Amino acid sequence: MAAGTGLLATSLSSCAGPPMLEASVIDHRITVPLSAFVGSDFQIIQPEGFLFDIGLVKGADGKFQAFVLECTHASTQLTPAGDGYTCPEHGSTFDIKGKVTRGPAQLPLRQLQTGVSSDTVTIYLR
């Protein structure tokens, strides 16, 4: 592994719903192996020491988008629900791409920059 990249733990959540991957954060980056997307276009990343999970989505075009799963209304951890995320605090919902589908939230989820190499996706937390 190159210096300055995050290490992804191999443990997957056994609960129903999208896979959840625990990740180390190094130099404000997380590295996810592309092999994590075999059979799934969506992963929940649980960054070590980070307040909120990250939704990592692989689009039909093969591009990746990462969103901080923090409600933009109540600053609450969102939970995966159907084809998006729900805020347990006041019921705001967001689609898989972070767009508000039901308020009271009005702003989309914060998107994080991603980069792809031959075998990994890097999520930049800054």
Model regions: which residues?
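Structural motif
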Residues: 47-49, 89, 96
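Short cysteine/histidine-rich metal-coordination sites, predominantly Zn2+-binding motifs
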Residues: 85-91, 101-110
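Short Cys/His-rich "knuckle" micro-motifs
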Residues: 78-82, 95-98
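N-terminal export signals
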Residues: 1-16
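Short Pro/Gly-enriched beta-strand edge/turn motifs at strand-loop
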Residues: 36-39, 93-99
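Surface loops and adjacent helix of pleckstrin homology
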Residues: 69, 90, 97-99, 126
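N-terminal pre-ligand scaffold of iron-sulfur
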Residues: 15-81, 108-126
